[in-house]
Amino acid sequence: MSENRNEGSSQAAKANSDTQTPSHFKVTHPRLRDQLKKKSSKKKGFKFVQEKMLKFQHVIRNQFLQQISQQMQCVPPGDQQCTQTSRKRKKMGYLLSQMVNFLWSNTVKKLKFKVPLPCLDSRCGIKVGHQTLSPWQTGQSRPSLGGFEAALASCTLSKRGAGIYESYHLSFQSYEAYQADKYHKDKNPSGYINLSTSENKLCLDLITARLTQSDMNLLDEAQLQYSDWKGQPFLREELASFLTHYCKAPTPLDPENVVVLNGCSSVFASLAMVLCDPGDALLIPTPCYNGFVFSSHLYSKIELIPVHLESQVPRSNLDSFQLTVDKLKLALTQAKKKAKKVKGLVLINPQNPLGDVYTQSSLQEYLVFAKTHKLHVIMDEIYMLSVFEPSVTFHSVLSIKDLPDPNMTHMIWGTSKDFGMSGIRFGVLYTHNKEVASAMKAFGYHHGVSGITQYKLCRLLQDKEWISKVYLPKNHSRLQKAYSYITKILKDLKIPFYNGGSGLFVWINLKAYLSPCTFDQEQILHQRFRDKKLLLSSGKSYMCIEPGWFRLVFAETHLHLQVAMDRFCHVLAEHKKHEK
């Protein structure tokens, strides 16, 4: 360990004598050093060091991401701009090494913290013991210090806590940057525009007006007290009526089969725990909603087994990304060969991120397959009222008169997407299985919805005339207009895209901009969009088997879309210029 420390220090010293430290760190580094000396003398211990270390790592990571992206844009290696970018990256690496060595030598060793000292290899990869971690790891949204960072976190967190910490930061780093620096036409014109998170911002005026009408303002004592953990009876009764109507159920749905929690992610994670044991698996067609990946690991500790769908199927009459029973059988067979215990099938309808809507016959085939293999079916229908293409018909699983296995079929819906109310945390499960409904009730203790929210939602869902005659027609019209605006630009740029006439997004093919077409290059392009303060979702995060796909959300105000697409076009134009 001492050899690594001396080598790192000598490299840092040499770098400082030959070059200047990047201007961003002229103040930051000395200040951190002085603070560390002062705090160390007061015996503040490891917690302070950890805090400063992680903060410093965050700054370093952002610099690495920007410079790696810039380096990839460079023309041949001998070019002056490319050389300067490479030098800046090395300076950053030396600075990180110097900081790590300082912390280790002055504080950490006194606490007998037995973790190998990280150092930097010649390519600025991080070495932890015998393991080398590239500054850009495939499939991750940021570089990671892997075992070293996990060891730092685990000094105060459990192993599970350290895993949650890492998983969260991998998943939400871009989102946190957006929350801290949002675009505003006047106040912050250079801020982030988020076309990554699927939110419907086209009808906020309609929803706000409806939620502030006088009938929404009742407040009684019952709303201020604990309620049935499944949800208030009046809300569950209204939800049963609402789903019967809009899902076209053949018979009235039972309020006792309704469970209300604070969001569809809570419903999915809780349902997975009820249906699966840790280590069990669920089949899911991919690309799929990436939130399921995060939720499945956070609580239930289950595995999602991808049923890969391809954009092009050679020598076949299948459509792009088409799910078939044969693909389900293949995925199930391969999982069993690996001794996986598959307990269910997750289907998203309308599909996210594709925007596809399953036909009634296809849906029936999937349900029969599940019954044959004794699998639960979890149907996520959160976009069921966001089908904006008139020629497309949505068929809810609750509309099927003779379900192959009602006891094993469970449907999830919420107001986040269809009503643009993602900030009002609400999700609903409808299941014909009384035992499942009873078990799910327990999760209301931790994931319940406030009484005031339940009352307002009940009043909103009761107003079917306003929903059917005012809200839905305007919402569909605005979605269609935004979709047309985005897809015209994509067509002009000759960018292929995919959407089945529903949802809040398009699935775009940027393979032509990746050379070579790899997930590494996909991540580089993803970072270049972020450098331009534009957030898109990369296909890798949706477990897509093919690199080059991105999800672009269009349910945004026209002004935001204009600025966002200007940035989008600029990034691609710059990329093309450097390719030449």
Curated annotation (Swiss-Prot):
Question: In what ranges is there compositional bias, type Polar residues?
Answer: 7-23
- The N6-(pyridoxal phosphate)lysine modification is found at K417
Q: Which GO terms describe its molecular function?
A: pyridoxal phosphate binding
Enumerate the InterPro entries for this protein: Aminotransferase_I/II_large, Ethylene_sulfur-biosynth, PyrdxlP-dep_Trfase, PyrdxlP-dep_Trfase_major, PyrdxlP-dep_Trfase_small
Annotated region Disordered: the residues are 1-43
In its UniProt record, which GO terms are filed under biological process? biosynthetic process
Print the keywords alphabetically. Answer: Pyridoxal phosphate
Q: Does the keyword Mitochondrion apply?
A: no
What superkingdom does the record give?
A: Eukaryota
Per the record, the similarity remark reads: Belongs to the class-I pyridoxal-phosphate-dependent aminotransferase family.
**How is this protein named in the record?**
Probable inactive 1-aminocyclopropane-1-carboxylate synthase-like protein 2
Native organism: Mus musculus
